[in-house]
Swiss-Prot record:
Natural source organism: Mycobacterium tuberculosis (strain ATCC 25618 / H37Rv)
Pathway: Amino-acid biosynthesis; L-cysteine biosynthesis
Name this polypeptide is given: S-sulfocysteine synthase
Modification N6-(pyridoxal phosphate)lysine occurs at: K65
Any Gene Ontology biological process: cysteine biosynthetic process
Gene name as annotated: cysK2
Gene3D superfamilies according to UniProt: 3.40.50.1100
A GO CC term assigned to this protein in UniProt: cytoplasm
Catalytic activity, reaction form: O-phospho-L-serine + thiosulfate = S-sulfo-L-cysteine + phosphate; O-phospho-L-serine + hydrogen sulfide + H(+) = L-cysteine + phosphate
Stored InterPro entries: Cys_Synth/Cystath_Beta-Synth (IPR050214), TrpB-like_PALP (IPR001926), TrpB-like_PALP_sf (IPR036052)
C-alpha cells in the first residue's frame, strides 16, 4: 500500500497520466523495454502515412549491445565458464565495450577491451571512466583488417591473464540468444511483424530477433543492411568509414539462410538519413541507424501500405557528434552530397559487382561456402 506521502505526490500528476515503474537497484536492470517510434519514410516522395516502426535501442544505458553483454556474462557464470572476479577480455568497436563495462560493474569482473584508432575519443574516455581497461592496437591485419588485429591481440592478452574469459561476440551463440527479449518486446509493442530491417555486424541481433519473430509469423521477411567495403555478404574488403555494421572477417553468428535480401549503404547515404532523422524526429543515431532508416523507408514505399515494418536502431547520436554531425568531418570525407536516390541499384548476386553506393540483392550468399 502506498504511503500518504506517495499518494499526495501522485495527486499532483495530471489526470490520466501513467507512471511506469522506474526504480532500479543496480544499472543492469535498466536494460530493455525500449520504446518504438513511428517514422514516416524520409524521402518525402510518397504517402506520408507510409513508414516504419523504429526500435530505439539507444534508450539502453550504453546501447543495444548492453543486452548481449549482460546475457553472455550471465550464461558464462551459470555454466562456470568464468570464475567470480575473473577478467573479461574482448574485442570491440565501442558499443559492446560499453555493455561489457556495465556487465563488469554488475557482476564484479575487471574488463579489458581491445579496440583500434577508429574508436571515438568520447567512447574511449567513457570506457576508462567506467573502470574498463582500453588496449589499442596500432596496425591493421594485412588481410582481416582492424577486426582481425584486435582478435589477435585478445588472444595474446588471454595468454597473459590466467583464468580470463573471452565472450567472443562473433561466434558465441549466447550473443544470438540475448536478443529474445528485444523480439518479445517488439511483439508486445507491434503485434504481428511482416518485415524486420537490421544492420549486420557480428550477426547477433539479426539472427536472434528474426528467429523469435518467425515463431509468431513464419512468413516474416528479414532485410539485412551492410556497408560498402564489408566482406559479410561476399563483397571484397576495402577501407570502411562506417562503424557498428559490416566486417572484414566472417562472423559465425551471421545466419545467412535467415535473410531474404541484403542492402549495402555508403557513408554519405547514412549521413543524410541520420541528419534527416535528427531534423524531423529528434531521434537519430550512428551509421547503423542511418543505413537502417534508409532501407526501412525504401521498404515502406514499395510494400503494401498495411505492411508492419520494424527497424532496429542500435544506438543514439551522442558518440557521433564529431563525425556524422560535424560539418568539418563530413566535408573532409565528402559526406554531404545531398539526398540519395529513392531506389537502390540492384545486382543479381553479390559476386557480380563491387558496390560503391546503395545497392540491393535478393540473392544472399555465405561467402565462406563459395567455391572459387
Amino acid at each position: 500500500m502506498r504511503s500518504r506521502q506517495t499518494r499526495d505526490r501522485y495527486r499532483l500528476l495530471p489526470e490520466g497520466y501513467q507512471v511506469t515503474p522506474g526504480r532500479n537497484r543496480h544499472p543492469g536492470t535498466m536494460v530493455g523495454n525500449t520504446p518504438v517510434l513511428w517514422i514516416p519514410e524520409l524521402s518525402g516522395t510518397s504517402d506520408p502515412d507510409r513508414g516504419f516502426w523504429a526500435k530505439l535501442e539507444g534508450f539502453n544505458p550504453g546501447g543495444m549491445k548492453d543486452r548481449p553483454a549482460l546475457y553472455m556474462v550471465e550464461c558464462a557464470r551459470a555454466r562456470g565458464d568464468i570464475a567470480p572476479g575473473a577478467a573479461i577480455v574482448e574485442s570491440t568497436g565501442g558499443t559492446l565495450g560499453l555493455g561489457l563495462a556495465l556487465a563488469g560493474k554488475v557482476y564484479r569482473h575487471p574488463v579489458t577491451l581491445v579496440t583500434d584508432p577508429g574508436l571515438e575519443p568520447i567512447i574511449a574516455r567513457m570506457l576508462t571512466a567506467y573502470g574498463a581497461g582500453v588496449d589499442m592496437v596500432t596496425q591493421p591485419h594485412p588481410v582481416g583488417g582492424w577486426q582481425q588485429a584486435r582478435k589477435d591481440r585478445v588472444a595474446q592478452l588471454m595468454a597473459e591473464y590466467p583464468g580470463a574469459w573471452n565472450p567472443n561476440q562473433y561466434g558465441n551463440p549466447d550473443n544470438v540468444g540475448a536478443y529474445r527479449s528485444l523480439a518479445l518486446e517488439l511483439v508486445a509493442q507491434l503485434g504481428r511483424i511482416d518485415v524486420l530491417v537490421c544492420s549486420v555486424g557480428t550477426g547477433g541481433h539479426s539472427a536472434g530477433v528474426a528467429r523469435v519473430l518467425r515463431e509468431f509469423n513464419p512468413d516474416m521477411r528479414l532485410i539485412g543492411v551492410d556497408t560498402i567495403g564489408s566482406t559479410i555478404f561476399g563483397q571484397p574488403a576495402s577501407n570502411r568509414l562506417m562503424r557498428g555494421l559490416g566486417s572484414s572477417i566472417y562472423p559465425r553468428n551471421v545466419d545467412y539462410r535467415a535473410f531474404d535480401e541484403v542492402h549495402w549503404v555508403a557513408p554519405p547515404e547514412a549521413v543524410w538519413a541520420c541528419r534527416s532523422l535528427a531534423a524531423t524526429h529528434y531521434a537519430s543515431g550512428g551509421w547503423s541507424v542511418g543505413a537502417v532508416a534508409l532501407v526501412a523507408g525504401w521498404a515502406a514505399r514499395n510494400l503494401p501500405a498495411d505492411t508492419t515494418i520494424a527497424a532496429v536502431f542500435p544506438d543514439g547520436p551522442q558518440r557521433y557528434f564529431d563525425t556524422i554531425y560535424n560539418d568539418a568531418y563530413c566535408n573532409e570525407h565528402e559526406l554531404l552530397g545531398g539526398q540519395p536516390p529513392t531506389e537502390p541499384d540492384e545486382i543479381a548476386s553479390p559476386l557480380d559487382a563491387v558496390v560503391t553506393r546503395w545497392t540491393r540483392s535478393t540473392t544472399v550468399i555465405d561467402p565462406t561456402q563459395v567455391v572459387s
